[in-house]
Amino acid sequence: NLVQFELLIMKVAKRSGLLSYSA
């Protein structure tokens, strides 16, 4: 699911501090 993938990206982005990834 695309939503699940986006949530995962957001989680990883928050962890590594790459918020620009989800933006």
Swiss-Prot record:
Expressed by the venom gland. The keyword Ion transport does not apply. Its EC number is 3.1.1.4. Its cofactor is Ca(2+). One of its GO terms (molecular function) is toxin activity. It is found in: Secreted. GO terms for biological process: lipid catabolic process. Keywords: Calcium, Disulfide bond, Hemostasis impairing toxin, Hydrolase, Lipid degradation, Lipid metabolism, Metal-binding, Platelet aggregation inhibiting toxin, Secreted, Toxin. Contains 7 disulfide bonds. It catalyses: a 1,2-diacyl-sn-glycero-3-phosphocholine + H2O = a 1-acyl-sn-glycero-3-phosphocholine + a fatty acid + H(+). GO terms for cellular component: extracellular region. Snake venom phospholipase A2 (PLA2) that significantly inhibits ADP-induced platelet aggregation in platelet-rich plasma of human, rabbit and guinea pig. PLA2 catalyzes the calcium-dependent hydrolysis of the 2-acyl groups in 3-sn-phosphoglycerides. Belongs to the phospholipase A2 family. Group II subfamily. This is Acidic phospholipase A2 Cvv-E6c. It comes from Crotalus viridis viridis (Prairie rattlesnake).
